[in-house]
């Protein structure tokens, strides 16, 4: 990644496209920041991310973008990385592929140990984020709601580094100790991020935040003779340096000099807690807590780490009781910065709920003697703390809630006209008494213009039964559900686009993230049933799935028009009216989104492939992922990336077995 240029501008957007439709007006208004909190109400397919990128370019502020799940965060990261190739666009999500938190269920008397699977690449990207924030100003961080969980303090992360200077003398044993204190691990066989090895007078270090280079340190006696960046695959020297600041290998660093102080405060808290249990006559809880804590203290003293070390974070960071943990937003406190909350109608409620969920789980662990009360101080931010850290914020949503509108003091910027000038789809309401037979007729009519169909139902049973029925009527149909892996999901969507399927049936997977321009009909079964899957926002999101095609239509099957249906239909019609007026005034003709189908047939080798075939498939998919990104087809790029991850897991699992 290149460093920023000496140009006065920090951020440089690179794109072959210029803002169109509603984008120029939205960019100009958002960049004014008439209020510190604003809403970008952008209809599906209007290019909201491109608008935000242009705002970043205009305001020239370090930025955090938060999405409500990893998939959307990955899509935003890929897109912004392409748009800002010379800036530090970083990815900050939870590094757990699987996470079962520690818990105690008093009603059952069951203790559940923490269990987790760490994704090393995501872990590296998190360290890369902190490294960039500690060393650069031109940083855009794309994260999930996990961003409100604790991380290393800015002061500590910046402090723990190693300056390497050509000509300076280093004792190799001392250098090894310094690397270990930065959480680097010796590995003589294979260098991966966070590892180092000694080979005579040469030390090779793979920085914990790097991907495309290894640091080679060549010594003559005790003197550092050369610092070189080398290619980790070819060992080719990329460049030589006079000096280098090596950052930590890991996100969390324990200050060895102050460790004794932390151990003393943990012991003091343990002593007080044991007295508390004694007063209440709970000897079993006291004994349990003493055993667990003393074991952890021994490990901390010996290794600087222990199982569940995060529960002692407040002591290790020397924070006062009940204080706010350090988090990613603390790296942005030195000046103005921008926060973008993507899909704010979902992201803000998630942020609100995480604090109380964490407190509730830990209260039982503390009450029954599994953890000290200070464990509560390692927690996500409360919503109030999250709000306190905000500088400037843009809430982005096709369906913002009343809260975001109030927070922005009604400063809502609408972006309804698409770059393709497509209209929001026409919405038709039909009785649901004959919905299945009517759907069959509609799917057959779709064949006239080679259109595809999405159908959303309320239950798994309904989805399975409907899929079976449609198959009996010779409809090429598939059922897409939550248990389908990314690779299989990608195959289904690609086959739908190719025409191998003409219809996909699903439940709640059809609201966000499915971008299939061939879909010209979305059918919503039981649209009048009250509840979250059929509220106004959900219905508008579902309607948006048909907004990529010039023939886009939505059929709501319902015997009555519910209040939520009425609101969604009226909002869709309001948008259609604005879009039609714009097209008429500017003489624009709507065009179906053009999106190449790049995925080739060999992907169907899948899990039954030989290892050689899988390796070839990974190579092919990597090429297609890059091509999709180059074409700005970011949703497909993310789907392919997730498929590569799955294949790599299968590949590694086969090797280990």
From Swiss-Prot:
One of its GO terms (biological process) is SOS response. Signal peptide: none annotated. Residues 29-416 form the Helicase ATP-binding domain. A motif (Beta-hairpin) lies at residues 95-118. The UvrABC repair system catalyzes the recognition and processing of DNA lesions. A damage recognition complex composed of 2 UvrA and 2 UvrB subunits scans DNA for abnormalities. Upon binding of the UvrA(2)B(2) complex to a putative damaged site, the DNA wraps around one UvrB monomer. DNA wrap is dependent on ATP binding by UvrB and probably causes local melting of the DNA helix, facilitating insertion of UvrB beta-hairpin between the DNA strands. Then UvrB probes one DNA strand for the presence of a lesion. Forms a heterotetramer with UvrA during the search for lesions. Interacts with UvrC in an incision complex. PANTHER family: UVRABC SYSTEM PROTEIN B. NCBIfam families: PRK05298.1, uvrb. The beta-hairpin motif is involved in DNA binding. This is UvrABC system protein B. It comes from Mycoplasma pneumoniae (strain ATCC 29342 / M129 / Subtype 1) (Mycoplasmoides pneumoniae). The lineage of its organism: Bacteria, Bacillati, Mycoplasmatota, Mycoplasmoidales, Mycoplasmoidaceae. The gene is uvrB.
């Amino acid at each position: 990644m290149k460093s920023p240029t000496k140009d006065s501008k920090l951020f440089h957007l690179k794109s072959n496209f210029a803002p169109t439709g509603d984008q120029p007006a939205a960019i100009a208004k958002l960049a004014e920041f008439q209020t510190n909190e604003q809403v970008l109400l952008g209809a599906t397919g209007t290019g909201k991310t491109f608008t935000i990128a242009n705002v970043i370019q205009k305001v020239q502020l370090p930025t955090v973008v938060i999405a409500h799940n990893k998939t959307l965060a990955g899509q935003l990261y890929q897109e912004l990385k392409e748009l800002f190739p010379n800036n530090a666009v970083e990815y900050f999500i939870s590094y757990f592929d699987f996470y079962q938190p520690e818990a105690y269920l008093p009603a059952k008397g069951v203790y559940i140990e923490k269990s987790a699977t760490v994704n090393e690449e995501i872990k590296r990207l998190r360290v890369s984020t902190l490294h960039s924030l500690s060393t650069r100003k031109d940083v855009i961080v794309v994260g999930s709601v996990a961003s409100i969980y604790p991380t290393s303090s800015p002061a500590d992360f910046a402090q723990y580094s190693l300056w390497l200077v050509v000509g300076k003398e280093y004792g190799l044993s001392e250098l090894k100790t310094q690397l270990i204190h930065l959480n680097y691990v010796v590995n003589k066989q294979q260098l991966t991020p966070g590892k180092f090895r000694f080979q005579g007078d040469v030390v090779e270090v793979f920085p914990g935040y790097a991907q495309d280079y290894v640091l080679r340190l060549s010594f003559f006696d005790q003197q550092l003779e050369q610092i070189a960046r080398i290619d980790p695959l070819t060992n080719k020297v990329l460049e030589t340096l006079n000096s280098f600041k090596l950052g930590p290998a890991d996100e969390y660093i324990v200050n060895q000099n102050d460790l004794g102080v932390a151990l003393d405060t943990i012991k003091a808290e343990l002593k007080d807690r044991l007295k508390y249990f004694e007063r209440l006559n709970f000897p079993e809880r006291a004994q349990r807590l003493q055993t667990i804590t003393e074991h952890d203290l021994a490990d901390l003293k010996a290794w600087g780490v222990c199982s569940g070390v995060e529960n002692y974070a407040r002591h290790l960071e020397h924070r006062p009781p009940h204080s706010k943990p350090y988090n990613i937003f603390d790296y942005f406190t030195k000046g103005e910065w921008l926060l973008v909350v993507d899909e704010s109608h979902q992201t803000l409620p998630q942020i609100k709920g995480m604090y109380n969920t964490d407190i509730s789980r830990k209260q039982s662990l503390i009450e029954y003697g599994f953890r000290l009360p200070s464990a509560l101080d390692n927690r996500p931010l409360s919503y109030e703390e999250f709000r306190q850290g905000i500088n400037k914020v843009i809430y982005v949503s096709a369906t913002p809630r009343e809260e975001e509108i109030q927070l922005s003091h009604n400063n809502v910027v609408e972006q309804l006209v698409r770059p393709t000038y497509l209209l929001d789809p026409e919405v038709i309401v039909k009785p649901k008494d004959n919905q299945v037979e009517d759907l069959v007729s509609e799917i057959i009519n779709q064949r006239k213009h080679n259109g595809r169909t999405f159908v959303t139902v309320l239950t798994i049973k309904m989805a399975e039964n409907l899929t079976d029925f449609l198959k009996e009527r010779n409809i090429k149909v598939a059922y897409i559900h939550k248990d389908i892996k990314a690779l299989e999901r990608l195959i289904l969507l690609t086959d739908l686009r190719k025409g191998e399927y003409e219809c996909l049936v699903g439940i709640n997977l059809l609201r966000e993230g499915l971008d299939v321009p061939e879909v010209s009909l979305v059918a919503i079964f039981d649209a009048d049933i009250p509840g979250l899957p059929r509220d106004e926002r959900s219905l508008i999101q579902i309607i948006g799935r048909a907004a990529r095609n010039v023939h886009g239509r939505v059929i709501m099957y319902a015997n009555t028009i519910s209040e939520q249906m009425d609101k969604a239909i009226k909002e869709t019609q309001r948008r259609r009216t604005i879009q039609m007026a714009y097209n008429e005034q500017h003489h624009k003709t709507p065009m179906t989104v053009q999106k190449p189908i790049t995925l080739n047939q060999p992907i169907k080798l899948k899990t039954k492939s030989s290892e050689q075939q899988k390796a070839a498939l990974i190579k092919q998919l990597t090429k297609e992922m890059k091509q999709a990104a180059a074409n700005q087809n970011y949703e497909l790029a993310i789907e392919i990336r997730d498929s590569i991850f799955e294949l790599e897991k299968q590949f590694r699992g086969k090797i280990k077995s």
